[in-house]
């Protein structure tokens, strides 16, 4: 993974550098994350693995929902959770990363006019 791909995935999941340093790198070291995005330092394998796993989970959710959309008639609506607390009211076992993946999927489907958000 290169610096551009790192930035792209951070944006796809609508995460700040500080959030990525805390939840993905699990170090809280925002400066290191900035260096990775600027291409000044190599991205640690564990960070790459975590992001690729998130990307795969997102892809899996997208495909599952698109399949459901293709098999149903009527309104297509998907919940949009403004914050982690609202997400955890519906998905009590969900964590911050789960919420970001869910929101990314919801935004993608809305952007392609496949789902309405509620």
UniProtKB/Swiss-Prot annotation:
Superkingdom of this protein's organism: Bacteria
Gene Ontology MF annotations: DNA binding
SUPFAM superfamilies, alphabetized: lambda repressor-like DNA-binding domains
Disulfide bond sites: none
Designated name of the protein: Uncharacterized protein YdiL
Source species of the chain: Escherichia coli (strain K12)
Lineage of producing organism: Bacteria, Pseudomonadati, Pseudomonadota, Gammaproteobacteria, Enterobacterales
